[in-house]
Amino acid sequence: MIAAQTRHAAGVLEDCARVKQSIVTLDMEGVLTPEIWIAVAEKTKLPELRRTTRDEPDYDKLMRGRLAILDQHGIKLSDIQAVIGSLRPLAGAKEFLDELRALVQVVILSDTFEQFAAPLLRQLNFPTLLCHRLVVADDRIVDYQLRIRDQKREAVAAFRRMNYHVISAGDSYNDTAMLKEANVGFLIHAPDNVKQEFPQFQAVEAHADLLKLIKGAM
């Protein structure tokens, strides 16, 4: 009896392993929405805030620099949130995401922060977002807390351990670990330096082209 149950359980697990159940992970900024820090740089006329993960692969170095600039110029969380409230998703992003979510489960893996994301998520019909959190005191951003280190890659690795076929897309240096960990990875809207350093990832510029690639990889 026990042996039969064991064989049955093994058979069920084997059947599960044969089923290719896909999940898609996407970066947010630069893929679905404008780059928040570039928008803040334009509003505050501080060009040094234009530096993003497209330019700097060391995320902690990038964020420490941003926090120092904000402190130096007295820029508060509410100032940044006002800028974010004026932003709209990239052209075609909502339609792309709506169609994709009708086909497959989608998770947004972003190095943005909970306190930044809500206005943009609302316009995208509230997709699932995993991101980090700011430490705020009296409206001043004093620090940031990572969800976990290397959260994009770790999330993809966890999905793969759950027997998901993971398809990932991003645009920046901080997405490349996620793309490497995924079963299939694509670049969209990536700058030339990222495309040149990571030629193994097919690169596209249009959401329609990315949707075709994802459908083909499922």
Which role does the model predict for each range below?
Residues 212-218:
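Short amphipathic alpha-helix with an adjacent loop that forms part of the alpha/beta core around
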